[in-house]
């Protein structure tokens, strides 16, 4: 079944949990799509897990379009959400609409995601008015890492918790179809989920959200030096890959690979004529 923004809303209405993962390339997107997931986020997290940056701030629109286009080619039934990178929407409403349009038209995404609450309401409204579905993102917003002073849980005191609830309501009123809640106390995330009629997608926000999202490299255990508290390792792919790499190196060095079964043949009479 093809997943759309309507699918997301129906899931919330019916009490069905939504599932999302990140993807950044064709082959990964194809595998995730075949697994039956609801949505893929082509996140600006690619800056850290694919490009090796320390944060997401250096990711460009060209980066996002390039990776979103690859992911879009790999899916058949999954909703593809393209992340709007730092300074692609904060500077003006005009820039927000133009860049959102590029992720749809050039990247092949179905929807876009942008970070922020009350400060980006006008951008959300304008993008929605341009007939582009918007997924919002509040709580820990990685593009604001310099303001937060690091990757920290958000909404732990009354004032900040209340602001998150109010932001969620304003986001819904602006026309967004879903909200990502990142690194928010579980009980607060549950309150926000009940306060809005659109789906909430949690990452480090407890099981009370309408759905969950993780960075696929994290949940597959691909990086031993990156292990956020909220991540469960569903497979140990990193170690499996290293074992495979080591086995390949060993067999090449020993001369056991490639063996006859991996080689192509030529008639000996042809060889005789070459000398």
UniProtKB/Swiss-Prot annotation:
Its EC number is 2.1.2.11. Binds 1 Mg(2+) ion per subunit. Pathway: Cofactor biosynthesis; (R)-pantothenate biosynthesis; (R)-pantoate from 3-methyl-2-oxobutanoate: step 1/2. It catalyses: 3-methyl-2-oxobutanoate + (6R)-5,10-methylene-5,6,7,8-tetrahydrofolate + H2O = 2-dehydropantoate + (6S)-5,6,7,8-tetrahydrofolate. One of its GO terms (biological process) is pantothenate biosynthetic process. It comes from the Bacteria. The active site is at 182 (proton acceptor). GO terms for molecular function: 3-methyl-2-oxobutanoate hydroxymethyltransferase activity; magnesium ion binding. It is an enzyme of class 2 (transferase). 3-methyl-2-oxobutanoate binds at residues 44-45, 83, 113. Keywords: Cytoplasm, Magnesium, Metal-binding, Pantothenate biosynthesis, Transferase. It is found in: Cytoplasm. SUPFAM superfamilies: Phosphoenolpyruvate/pyruvate domain. Its cofactor is Mg(2+). One of its GO terms (cellular component) is cytoplasm. Mg(2+) binds at residues 44, 83, 115. Gene3D superfamilies: Phosphoenolpyruvate-binding domains. Catalyzes the reversible reaction in which hydroxymethyl group from 5,10-methylenetetrahydrofolate is transferred onto alpha-ketoisovalerate to form ketopantoate. NCBIfam families: panB, PRK00311.1. Homodecamer; pentamer of dimers. HAMAP family: PanB (MF_00156). Belongs to the PanB family. This is 3-methyl-2-oxobutanoate hydroxymethyltransferase.
């Amino acid at each position: 079944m093809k997943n759309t923004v309507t699918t997301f809303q129906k899931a919330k209405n019916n009490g069905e949990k939504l599932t999302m993962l990140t993807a950044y390339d064709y082959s990964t997107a194809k595998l995730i799509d075949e697994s039956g997931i609801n949505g893929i986020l082509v996140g600006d997290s690619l800056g850290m897990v694919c490009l090796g940056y320390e944060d997401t701030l250096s990711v460009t629109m060209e980066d996002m379009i390039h990776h979103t286009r690859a992911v879009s080619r790999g899916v058949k039934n999954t909703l593809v959400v393209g992340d709007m990178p730092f300074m692609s929407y904060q500077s003006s409403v005009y820039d927000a609409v133009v860049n959102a349009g590029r992720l749809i038209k050039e990247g092949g995404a179905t929807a876009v995601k942008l970070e922020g609450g009350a400060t980006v309401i006008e951008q959300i409204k304008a993008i929605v008015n341009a007939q582009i579905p918007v997924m919002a993102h509040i709580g820990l917003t990685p593009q604001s890492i310099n303001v937060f002073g690091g990757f920290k849980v958000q909404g732990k005191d009354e004032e900040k918790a209340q602001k998150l609830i109010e932001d969620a309501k304003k986001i819904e009123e602006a026309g967004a179809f879903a909200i990502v809640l990142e690194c928010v106390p579980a009980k607060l995330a549950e309150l926000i989920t009940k306060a809005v009629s659109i789906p909430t997608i949690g990452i480090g926000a407890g099981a009370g959200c309408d759905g969950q999202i993780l960075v696929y490299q994290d949940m597959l255990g691909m990086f031993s030096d990156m292990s956020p508290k909220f991540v469960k390792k569903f497979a140990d792919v990193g170690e499996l890959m290293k074992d495979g790499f080591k086995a390949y190196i060993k067999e090449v060095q020993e001369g056991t690979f490639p063996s006859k079964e991996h080689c192509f043949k030529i008639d000996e009479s042809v060889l005789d004529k070459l000398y």
